[in-house]
Amino acid sequence: MAKPTPVTDTLARFVAEADFSTISEKALTNAKMHILDTLGAALVGVTTDTATIAFDYCKRVGHNDEATIWGTRQKASAPMAAFANGLLGHAIDFDDWDAFIHAGHPTCMVTAAVLSLGEVTGSSGEDLLKAYALGIEILTKIAANAPNVQDRGFHSTPVLGSIGAAIACASLLRLTPDKIKAALGITASGAGGIHRQQGSMVKPFHAANAARNGVEAALLAEKGFTADAAILEAPRGFCDTFFGPGTCNYEKMIENIGKPYFLESPGLGLKWHPCSAPQFLAADASLYLKRAHKIDFASVAKIEVNIPPLRYQRHYAAEVKTGLRGKFAINYVVAMCILDGKLELTTFTDEKVNQSQVQEALQKVKVICDETIPEPGPYCPVAVELKDGTRLSHTAKIAKGDPRNPMTEDEVVEKFRSNAKLVIADKQTEKLIAAVRDLEAVGNVQEMVDAMIPN
């Protein structure tokens, strides 16, 4: 029998031997923007009911006040702070996403894990940047050479995020290759999440678990806790379990690691709209029609949006009664684009969803399950028929915020300001922006954390 490709060992050695100087300027710049964007999303997350429940839970189970829960004066142990911060980062689904390899929403978990642990260890900004880049690199290497785990009912965000969080924390703790392998083995057994949970509080709970899982795995491994040393590639291991036996390309997983880093190319996407990424093309097409033709909703007879079968199954909701459900319902997103001409945080509140005008608008949207569009939906046709018989249509192909149609650095910073102002003062906001933009020069990441504590 052929000897298995040593994926776990190779990746662990790469992480242990990685040098900050080998990470390109573009990768580092992108890393900073994704970290900043995630912190902004997390600060908005503080205002949600999901967060309120999580904060109370942390008070009940967390008795070691060593790490800060962002946007609050509350502290917890590093694993529990990572849990809370991971949840905050994904609470409103306004954090980054992967547009190419079904890697979910990586940054919320990796940043929550590494910044929560980094606060305890007194890590530098350079150490945090390196650890973050490595966490993203390894989880995307796995995802790029495996099938879509969501086709098997798992949620890719926590499955892969657990790996990324553990790698980032292992880097921060400067673990040896053997201990990194142990951390991977530990985190693999804590990974998981069911895709059906989108549109519920459990979706950000998945990110919370992955961040906590990564911190715990690295801390246990640091102290000598052992695990299977070939967990990624071994029979009945991580890849077999989540992706299916024989479905992963292990040779490709260990080819050209960091050449370039995924953060440089192809890169992660940043969210222009505060809803789930699969709705972005429909949103962009609808907003184009609204603005280009100055559509008055009173003149609209019906709206049609075509999506492929799997997207129809996952992102059409016959009934939308909560803002959270609306984030994942393509018919709601399209209705709001044509009705209001914009998507804002307030678009996805229970109060907004249940307005009579909004519910009436929903009835005008017909979502068509179109088998001629390939999965997962690389383009999205939207048509608006007016009461006078005029038919207007537009097809969006690359969403705003996709790495191929990126947000500018100024747009990312303005998005952060808009989010952060809900929780912290302007002076703190600007201090945090400056710290992240020059993260290599930050001597202790406590500086970043302190800027997120409300005055």
Protein language model regions, located:
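Hydrophobic alpha-helical hairpins/lids featuring a short glycine-rich hinge
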Residues: 86-143
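Short amphipathic alpha-helical face segments that pack within enzyme cores
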Residues: 108-116, 160, 164-168, 213, ...
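Terminal-appendage/accessory-domain detector
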Residues: 1-103, 199-213, 219-455
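Glycine-rich, mobile lid/loop segments that gate access to catalytic sites or pores
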Residues: 118-217, 228-235
